[in-house]
Amino acid sequence: MLFPSLVQDDFLNDIESVIELSKKLPFKGPTDDFFNKINGGWPGERTDCLSVLNTNFYIYFCSKVLKLYYPGEIICFEAELYFQRIPSTFNFPGWIHQDSNQLSAVCYLSNHKDSGTSLYKPKNFYNVYSDAIDKLKKKSYRDSDFSEESAAARDAWNNKFDCILDVPSYRNRVFCFEGSKYHGVKNFTSENTEDDRLTLICFFQKIEGNIKYPAVESRKI
């Protein structure tokens, strides 16, 4: 493990301006070419990458996340950053999965307290994320497949894991974790609000510089 899981509250300097920015951008869902082009499999809608839509905000957000790990270093990075919006009607749990990137970050922008992110570990070491599971996950999100058969497949897969950490989705909180960690959302809706769930999601593909990894340095003592 190179990146410890990390939670930071009051992350954005001006969350209201960030929310207003999201309202000015087009969101794309399962029927859009964008979704199929990148072979995406997620619930709800996303914007295009903010590196294209708003470069200054993209650099601000990604740099701010990396400063949580490397406060004194100048870091070069490659990352994807999106707004994601999930409708309040999406009253289903998500699929437990892994990301292919080095570091992931989720920033919660809406008032959903009960739809945070959870980390998991397999009950058996040989329960590995496979192409077959990934295809089922993507199909259920892409086709809005909420059938009993799809739910049974999701639950059968999710039941192979034990939850090791629940992070509530408090507004303006960022949660960072290694992409290889199994993670998921137990519920995309929350009893305290009927608004759509709005987040910023960031995937760091490459992080370079004169880096000392916190977990590695800790093990030297």
Feature map (PLM): residue ranges:
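Non-heme Fe(II)/2-oxoglutarate
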Residues: 1-94, 117, 123, 132-135
